Regions:
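Tryptophan-anchored aromatic micro-motifs
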Residues: 8-10
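Basic/aromatic-rich interaction segments and small domains that mediate binding to polyanionic partners
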Residues: 13-44
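Intrinsically disordered, low-complexity, charged/polar segments
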Residues: 36-58
Length: 58
């Protein structure tokens, strides 16, 4: 389960942070790409699959 504040690192060093999660009022996960300063909105299943291959930083 993803939680607000979780950070993940991709193989190329790009870090992503979850800043909106299901335990908030959101129906989507909001994931920030910290390298490019963009926000990605994903459905829960897609967000979990997207981050599953990455290393958890915190």
């Amino acid at each position: 389960m993803l939680h607000k504040g979780d950070k993940y690192r991709d193989v190329d060093g790009t870090e992503f942070q979850v800043f909106g999660a299901l335990d908030d009022t959101y129906t989507y996960f909001f994931i920030a790409n910290l390298k490019q300063n963009i926000v990605i909105r994903m459905q829960p299943k897609n967000a979990t699959e997207f981050l599953s291959g990455m290393e958890k930083v915190n």
